[in-house]
């Protein structure tokens, strides 16, 4: 019989949908039969309230094949005109070592992992992060460092907040900012200070530090215009007032310059972009945050520490986790959860690959080229603002500023205008002698009349950095920076670290509320295109036409997926999206002349919600949940009656973190709107909504969108993320602005929430690719299959572990909560025991004890097929059988596969085995493990020991052997 497929079908423009979605049609039918429903449509009807379901498909273009999407995006990228940028201001051209590019940035073993909450299967990433902390403490001269922040500007804002927290002796409400800080840093700090109620002074330290009263001050080192001030003296002045001294430092300059820690700084922040991370039109990049040990419990962000496992072997873990927002909620040090793990480890590997000598050589080359440029400009008659500098010159040019800028543009060069009458030039590791010749030609008004060898001779003879400014000895002297200088050794080291971790290239990661879905290769390819990576974030927007068009298209795509009218791409993490959304609400009410301070937050909310509300200076009022896990309407009514027109917003996650679609969501929205307040719908669970229901249509005024969840940006082992916000029309005029790039429709008074205008712009192509290849049909199918997979797991496990919450028809949303409390009471087995035992089956654990203590929250996503779901369910059922044996006395409560989990190769290779179960039961409890197994490299880690004996820098190399 002849095949009658149409030619259109043979082109298979929608084939990516079946690549992204795990179950095939045969598996779908089997899973639906297990659920006793006839079709996916019937399942959705029984799961999602009819009042919110969309009747029409999403207004998106038809899906296209992978190669077509890549061609379309390549044509957009080609519209970016990448000039040579000497703009500086915290962003510089750099070279990513190819061994790191290929084996880390382009490697799913690194970019698809999750935050290392289960350290026994994350020792590789943890070692990379410990290396990062070692690098930062070495370069800054500080006692400790955290494991990265989102960007330099938000790190500065976090340092300001920390200065207020720890400065108990100082009652001032004022903070001092060096006027030579980067403009984007000043803007973000002003925004944060406004909502904390801090007063801000921006002035020259040499003029104003001694006479002002403040609880903290930040100094830029070197300054934005390249000058190097009397940092040590200024630090002493600040500390004489019982205020904290914060230094924002350029990481490359610290290779040569005296460290801020050596000069007495309390906190040192900055950005690691120069250490092998592309500019990417603003990100993503890893910021650093270093501090004195006495402030460790007041520090934001994650800290990696050294501990021991149950066999006494050295092991790494995230230390002092009780500081984090998901535990302390509105009392947390910060709302930040995602940081920039992937970029942090890349920068550490950059330092390790080059080593102390190589990094020193790069820094000295940059400095000598800068001295040569200074000699050339002086010989042409130009006046330099500073005679002391590292890599940046500020040239006083008077009324020649515009002609020089025009001349530079003609030569495809970007310079930086420093106010009126001055230009700055920042050199980088990519600067060559030919570049110097081109720069001098711009200032000479024609071909360079200068001879490079003579300029070099002058530069070598002239010392612009006095001895008291230079570092005493080389930085990066720890052994880890002298081990891996050949590509062979670095390649093997990176592979060793990768092999110690479980990422999506090994198995499903069923973390609830995290959406660990496929990060398709086609989506990742554009991230490393030079047209995207080499663009300076403050280059004229006319040079970034491709980016601008891609932003516009992505904003329309995200608006279509959510039902909102406007999208801001600036927030570079979900936490920052929450903060930006709440500030938008505040600005809206300010414009109306209304003062509202209450934020209602359901008991089940993400811990980030109350932390974000507190940062926005809102008072958190908790709304109770009923016995079914839904918002308690009676309690909501009582809180509305009590606070009325003082309510600014409610923050509600939908579907809820309890894993159900609440039937009364529209009723909740109506009640909030009735008192003039706004509805913030947390977008963490959008993966169950896209194409099915739109928050902008069923009552939401604003939502943040976790692009690293629903829209396929990978988690990177703990970052990068992206958290743009969608708003309805009435909130659009109040979206975040930026001091250095015009964002259409915004004004400066709205404030700034991220260092870069469009956040981590270079990873936005990932979400663009995903939506373009899925189209309306695929986006809806992704949500439907996510719901199908979660319900299949719930059905298979419910006779073994109680499902805590479900909807009125007995179905869950895209995730489900297993209630382990009865088992714990009967057997003594904890949720941690089960999480560690899952490692022996090759799985990362679900989310533990959130949002309810004593539970596991499971989210399989649409990308996993029935085989993988069954593999996970079989593991959980086998674990339940082991618990039954403990309950019945067949296994001792203190010696069984759960309390001893996870088991390592050291365990099974040891000549002694004195346990109540066999080695096979320990390590190969199911048959599939005989064919392939991912081994934990350490046994269960001692958390208490690690916090009591806090070590956050690298041990000696011998300790790793």
Swiss-Prot record:
Annotated Pfam families: GcvP2_C, GDC-P
The protein's Enzyme Commission number: 1.4.4.2
Gene Ontology, cellular component aspect: cytosol; glycine cleavage complex
GO molecular function, one term: glycine dehydrogenase (decarboxylating) activity
Catalytic activity from the UniProt record: N(6)-[(R)-lipoyl]-L-lysyl-[glycine-cleavage complex H protein] + glycine + H(+) = N(6)-[(R)-S(8)-aminomethyldihydrolipoyl]-L-lysyl-[glycine-cleavage complex H protein] + CO2
Entry cofactors: pyridoxal 5'-phosphate
One GO BP: glycine decarboxylation via glycine cleavage system
Oxidoreductase is among the record's keywords: yes
Keywords: Oxidoreductase, Pyridoxal phosphate
Source species, domain of life: Bacteria
Role this protein plays: The glycine cleavage system catalyzes the degradation of glycine. The P protein binds the alpha-amino group of glycine through its pyridoxal phosphate cofactor; CO(2) is released and the remaining methylamine moiety is then transferred to the lipoamide cofactor of the H protein.
Name of the molecule in the record: Glycine dehydrogenase (decarboxylating)
Native source organism of the sequence: Teredinibacter turnerae (strain ATCC 39867 / T7901)
């Amino acid at each position: 019989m002849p095949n009658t497929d149409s030619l259109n079908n043979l082109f298979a423009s929608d084939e990516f949908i079946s690549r992204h979605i795990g179950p095939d049609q045969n598996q779908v039918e089997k899973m639906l039969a297990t659920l006793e429903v006839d079709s996916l449509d019937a399942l959705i009807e029984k799961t999602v309230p009819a009042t919110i379901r969309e009747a029409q498909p999403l207004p998106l273009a038809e899906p296209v094949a992978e190669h077509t999407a890549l061609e379309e995006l390549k044509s957009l990228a080609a519209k970016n005109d990448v000039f040579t940028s000497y703009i500086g201001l915290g962003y510089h051209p750099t070279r990513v070592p190819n061994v790191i590019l290929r084996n880390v940035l382009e490697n799913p073993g690194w970019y698809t992992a999750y935050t290392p909450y289960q350290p026994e299967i994350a020792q590789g990433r943890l070692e990379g992060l410990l290396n990062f902390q070692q690098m930062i403490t070495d370069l800054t001269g500080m006692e400790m460092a955290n494991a990265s922040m989102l960007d330099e500007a938000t790190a500065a804002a976090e340092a300001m907040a920390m200065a207020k927290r720890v400065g108990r002796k100082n009652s001032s409400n004022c903070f001092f900012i060096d006027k030579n800080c980067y403009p984007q840093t000043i803007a973000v700090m002003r925004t944060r200070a406004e909502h904390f109620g801090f007063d801000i002074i921006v002035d020259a330290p040499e003029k104003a530090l001694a006479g002002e009263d403040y609880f903290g001050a930040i100094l830029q080192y070197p300054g934005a215009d390249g000058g190097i001030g009397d940092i040590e003296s200024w630090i002493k002045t600040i500390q004489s007032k019982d205020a904290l001294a914060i230094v924002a430092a350029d990481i490359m300059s610290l290779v040569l310059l005296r460290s801020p820690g050596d000069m007495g700084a309390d906190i040192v922040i900055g950005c690691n972009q120069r250490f092998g991370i592309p500019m990417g039109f603003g990100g993503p990049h890893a910021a650093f945050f270093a501090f004195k040990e006495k402030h460790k419990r007041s520090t934001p962000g994650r800290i990696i520490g050294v501990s021991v496992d149950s066999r006494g072997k050295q092991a790494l873990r995230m230390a002092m986790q009780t500081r984090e927002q998901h535990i302390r909620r509105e009392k947390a040090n910060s709302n930040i959860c995602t940081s920039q793990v992937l970029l942090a480890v890349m920068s550490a590997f950059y330092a390790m690959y080059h080593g102390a000598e190589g990094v020193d050589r790069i820094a000295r080359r940059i400095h000598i080229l800068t001295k040569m440029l200074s000699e050339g400009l002086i010989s042409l008659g130009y006046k330099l603002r500073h005679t002391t500098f590292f890599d940046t010159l500020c040239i006083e040019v008077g009324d020649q500023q515009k002609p020089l800028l025009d001349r530079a543009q003609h030569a495809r060069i970007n310079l930086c205008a420093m106010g009126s009458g001055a230009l700055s030039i920042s050199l980088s590791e990519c600067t060559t002698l030919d570049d110097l010749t081109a720069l001098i030609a711009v200032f000479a008004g024609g071909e360079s009349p200068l001879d490079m060898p003579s300029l070099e001779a002058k530069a070598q003879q002239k010392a612009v950095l006095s001895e008291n400014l230079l570092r005493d000895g080389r930085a990066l002297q720890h052994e880890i920076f002298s081990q891996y200088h050949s590509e062979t050794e670095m390649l093997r080291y990176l592979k060793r670290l990768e092999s110690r971790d479980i990422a999506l290239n090994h198995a499903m990661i069923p973390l609830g509320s995290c959406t660990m879905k496929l990060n398709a290769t086609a989506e990742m390819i554009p991230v490393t295109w030079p047209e995207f990576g080499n663009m300076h974030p403050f280059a004229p927007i006319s040079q970034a036409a491709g980016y601008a068009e891609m932003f516009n298209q992505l904003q329309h795509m995200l608006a279509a997926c959510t039902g909102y009218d406007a999208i801001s791409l600036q927030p570079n993490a979900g936490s920052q999206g929450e903060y930006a959304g709440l500030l938008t609400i505040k600005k809206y009410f300010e414009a109306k002349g209304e003062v509202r301070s209450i934020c209602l937050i359901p008991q089940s909310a993400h811990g980030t919600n109350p932390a974000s509300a507190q940062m926005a200076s809102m008072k958190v009022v908790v709304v109770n949940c009923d016995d079914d896990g839904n918002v308690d309407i009676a309690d909501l009514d009582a809180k509305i009656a009590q606070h009325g027109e003082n309510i600014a917003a409610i923050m509600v996650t939908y579907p809820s973190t309890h894993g159900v679609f609440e039937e009364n969501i529209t009723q909740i929205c109506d009640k909030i709107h009735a008192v003039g307040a706004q509805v913030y719908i947390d977008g963490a669970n959008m993966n169950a909504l896209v194409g099915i229901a739109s928050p902008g249509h069923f009552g939401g005024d604003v939502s943040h969108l976790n692009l690293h969840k629903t829209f396929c940006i990978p988690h990177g082992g703990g970052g990068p993320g992206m958290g743009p916000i969608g708003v309805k029309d009435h909130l659009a005029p109040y979206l975040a602005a930026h001091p250095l790039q015009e964002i259409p429709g915004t004004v400066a008074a709205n404030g700034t929430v991220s260092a870069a205008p469009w956040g981590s712009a270079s990873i936005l192509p990932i979400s663009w690719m995903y939506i373009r290849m899925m189209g309306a049909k695929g986006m809806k199918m992704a949500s439907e299959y996510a719901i199908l997979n979660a319900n299949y797991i719930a059905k298979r496990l419910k006779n073994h572990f109680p499902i805590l919450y479900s909807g009125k028809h007995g179905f869950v949303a895209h995730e489900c909560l297993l209630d382990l409390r009865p088992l714990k009471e009967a057997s003594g087995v904890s949720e941690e025991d089960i999480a560690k035992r899952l490692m022996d089956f090759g799985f990362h654990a679900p989310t533990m004890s959130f949002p309810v203590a004593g539970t596991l929250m499971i989210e399989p996503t649409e990308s996993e097929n029935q085989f993988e779901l069954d593999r996970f369910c079989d593991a959980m059922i086998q674990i339940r059988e082991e618990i039954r044996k403990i309950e019945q006395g067949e296994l001792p409560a203190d010696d069984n596969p759960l309390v001893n989990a996870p088991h390592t190769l050291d365990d099974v290779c040891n000549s002694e085995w004195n346990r109540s179960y066999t080695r096979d039961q320990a390590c190969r409890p199911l048959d599939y493990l005989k064919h392939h197994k991912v081994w934990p490299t350490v046994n269960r880690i001692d958390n208490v020991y690690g916090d009591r004996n806090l070590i956050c820098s690298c041990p000696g190399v011998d300790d790793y052997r």
